[in-house]
Amino acid sequence: TGWNGRFDVAKDDGAKVSYDWRTGIMDWEGYGIPKGAKNKDLAMKYIAEMMKPEYMAEFAKYITYGPTNGKVYELGLMEDSRAKMMPSHPDNAKHQLTLSTEWYSKWRTIAAEMYTEMMTE
C-alpha cells in the first residue's frame, strides 16, 4: 500500500517496484477558505489560478500525482506517455475505486476500529 508518486520516485531511483491501477483507490482533496476571511475574493482568485490546467500539467512533470482538472487531458497539455502515468488519466481512473465521503461520514468510527483491529492482529 502506498502513494503512486512515491512508488514512481523509488522506481526512478532503481527500486524494483510496480503497481496496478486495478487495485487503486482515488481519494478526494479540496481547498477551503475560512468563513469570514478578510481576503476571500483574493483567495478565490488564487484557487482559480491554481486550478488552471496549464499549471496542473506543469506540476505533473515533477511528480505523478495526477491533475484534478480533466482539461489537462482534454487539451493534451501533457505528453501522452507522462499522462498515462497519472492516476486521474481517464484510462486509469476508470479502474479505481473512488472513496465515498458520504460512506465515511456515516461509518468512520466503526471503520477505524475495524481497520485498527485488522492491522494489529
Task: Give, region by region, the residue ranges found by the protein language model.
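Helix N-cap / beta->alpha transition motif
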Residues: W3, T68-K71, S100
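Sec/Tat-exported extracytoplasmic proteins
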Residues: A10-K11, M50-E54, I63, Y115-M119
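Mature extracytoplasmic/periplasmic domains
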Residues: I25, E29, P34-H95
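Conserved C-terminal helix/tail region of periplasmic/extracytoplasmic solute-binding proteins
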Residues: D91-E121
